[in-house]
Amino acid sequence: MYKRSLIAASLSVAALVSAQAMADINGGGATLPQQLYQEPGVLTAGFAAYIGVGSGNGKAAFLNNDYTKFVAGTTNKNVHWAGSDSKLSKTNETNPYLSAHGSAWGPLIQVPSVATSVALPFNKSGSNAVNFADVNTLCGVFSGRLTDWSQIPGSGRSGAITVVYRSESSGTTELFTRFLNASCSSTLEGGTFAITTSFGSSFSGGLPAGAVSAQGSQAVMNALNAAQGRITYMSPDFAAPTLAGLDDATKVAQVRGVSPAPANVSAAIGAVTPPTTAQRSDPNNWVPVFAATANPNDPSVRPYPTSGYPILGFTNLIFSQCYANATQTQQVRDFFTRHYGATANNDTAITNHRFVPLPASWKLAVRQSFLTSTNNLYIGHSNVCNGIGRPL
């Protein structure tokens, strides 16, 4: 009798542990914020460890509830959220998701998490600061028009330039190609840069000769450091191990005389206003993107700033408004409460990773919309999520 009771108790404990493991809030995606989200305490209770696989895989995992995009071969887990520096396409991603899954899973939420620069670390010995005073020089390096360090005025260096780029679908690539698309002269470069998550297909004239690819931020940095003459585009916390490192122009290039340190993008970010109350029901309006000029038909498109470090953007969070499990619903609310809190929040960790916390006005807009029970956008709103939600 005792033995049977012991076995039964053991099975009950095993079932409980298994249920708890399966109930983790699983997420992953962009590698740009990977180190931030893996910092202890940034993700709140109930969240599984963040898995960095690139923005493209993160979006695909969430939109199709496909955990194999995080871990190949693992089919017994669900996906509950994603990180992406690449904004969801309303036409190609958000609307198809709502058509396929909206009735069963509910609406999705897309909001900015932190603001970021895109730095230009390089591996070429020399004592001179490297400064792309003229953006056309930067464009020439990444189009392949300029092939030697001596063609970068004032660099004090010579030898072949080798571009290192992300091989997978990357939101960091999208942020960078947005800038190239808006800033580079097609006449001078002999082609154009498309806004894309795939750098290999961005420039219409093809990749620079000898360009080297790698998958993920850390692998790109490893490739950068493997040989002299290499340059890449990178999130600030991978580009340099310290804040002071971002200001070291012998290792991380300046653009127009300005380093990618957070202080040099914070003013531009502070000038970006959150969506109005009437605009907040559309996930597209929550994520600002930069372009050469504003778009009168899309309030999320803002012109690039004319001062400060110019290559900048946001990394974003993608969640569902509805979760089938009440505990998970509350855990998602708890994370939003922490991340977008007025006083107790993740700002210290964000700053330590060389990112820029969202302005107070943005955090307030998020709390008003997704954490206020009387708002129709409230996470788990009973009128929206009655009997539906992303699976446990």
UniProtKB/Swiss-Prot annotation:
Enzyme Commission code(s) on record: 3.1.3.1
Induction comment: Suppressed by inorganic phosphate.
Record's subunit section: Homodimer.
Annotated GO CC locations: extracellular region; periplasmic space
Signal peptide: 1-23
Enzyme superclass (EC): hydrolase
GO molecular function annotations of the record: alkaline phosphatase activity
Superkingdom of this protein's organism: Bacteria
A Pfam family that the UniProt record links to this protein: PBP_like_2
Protein name according to UniProt: Alkaline phosphatase L
Localization per record: Secreted; Periplasm
Family classification: Belongs to the PstS family.
Function: Has both a phosphomonoesterase and phosphodiesterase activity.
Disruption-associated phenotype: Strains are still able to make extracellular appendages that include PstS.
Stored InterPro entries: PBP_domain, Phosphate-bind_PstS
Keyword Hydrolase annotated: yes
Gene assigned in the entry: phoA2
